[in-house]
């Protein structure tokens, strides 16, 4: 074989291997997606209403319903496991769980250790007013925020005084909350944007086939998310 033919042979072999490699992607090193077809899906739950809600019976919440439907599409059922965020993500890192849900966002520091879906819902926060009210600037103004909502820090950074409440829907004054909730309350949203969060679901590291399948499922639900959140809050 002369030098020209040798180079051509090497090039053909390289291209063949490249095509074969692309054809087999995405892959799951631990074959999580294949395993889920043959057993229950192990789902880690982190309590975070309205995404994940603990009840006396079966868990509830928007992401709980999403994963329940996703499992059904795969021909399996979810096996629920409650725990704290760190505990659940550590278990996921070591492939002891298949999915973790709990209102996680792409700001999580765990992206170095586990996998995540693409952001499937953008949650934007604004200050809003009851119908007929006007406000030029929230500086020095009392703004109600539901207890436990981290957007309170953003409100304070704008110079407003935070009033923590159990249920913002009962407030008759300025409120800081997610846009989907403000719409449900029929409040008038101001131009005072406070924050914007991209929601994701956690999966084991490197399980690309599972991520791809879950991404495809979540994409089909993108226009339903606002309504699902509003329905969940209305159940309270």
Can you describe what each PLM-predicted range is?
Residues 1-22:
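Sec-dependent bacterial lipoprotein signal peptides
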Residues 22-104, 109, 151, 162-163:
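Extracytoplasmic small-molecule ligand-binding "clamshell" domains
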Residues 23-25, 61-73, 132-156, 195-236:
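Extended ligand-binding regions for polar small-molecule ligands
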Residues 40-47, 114-135, 201-204:
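Hydrophobic/proline-rich hinge and linker segments of small-molecule sensing/allosteric domains
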Residues 42-46, 142-144, 175:
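Short, well-ordered beta-strand segments
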Residues 70, 92-93, 168-171, 214:
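Hydrophobic residues within well-ordered alpha-helices
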Residues 102-113, 168-196:
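A ligand-binding cleft/hinge motif common to bilobed small-molecule-binding domains
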Residues 103-105, 130-133, 146-152, 178-182:
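Short, polar loop motifs at secondary-structure junctions
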């Amino acid at each position: 074989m002369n030098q020209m033919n040798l180079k051509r042979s090497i090039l053909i072999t390289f291209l063949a291997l490249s095509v074969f490699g692309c054809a087999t992607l995405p892959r799951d090193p631990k074959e999580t997606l294949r395993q889920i077809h043959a057993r229950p899906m192990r789902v880690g739950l982190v309590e975070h209403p309205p995404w994940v809600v603990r009840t006396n019976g079966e868990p509830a919440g928007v992401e709980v319903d999403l994963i329940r439907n996703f499992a059904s599409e795969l021909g399996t059922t979810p096996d629920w496991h409650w725990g704290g965020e760190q505990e659940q993500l550590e278990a996921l890192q070591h492939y002891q769980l298949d999915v973790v849900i709990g209102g996680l966002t792409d700001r999580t520091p765990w992206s170095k250790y586990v996998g995540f879906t693409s952001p499937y819902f953008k949650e934007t926060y604004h200050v809003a007013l009851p119908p007929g009210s006007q406000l030029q600037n929230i500086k020095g103004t009392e703004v109600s925020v539901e207890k436990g909502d981290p957007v309170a820090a953003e409100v304070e950074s704008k110079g407003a005084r935070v009033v923590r409440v159990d249920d913002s829907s009962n407030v008759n004054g300025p409120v800081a909350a997610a846009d989907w909730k403000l719409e449900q309350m029929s409040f008038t949203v101001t131009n005072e944007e406070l924050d914007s969060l991209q929601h994701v679901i956690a999966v084991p590291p490197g399980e690309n086939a599972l991520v791809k399948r879950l991404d495809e499922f979540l994409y089909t639900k993108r226009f339903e998310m606002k309504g699902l959140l509003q329905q969940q809050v209305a159940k309270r």
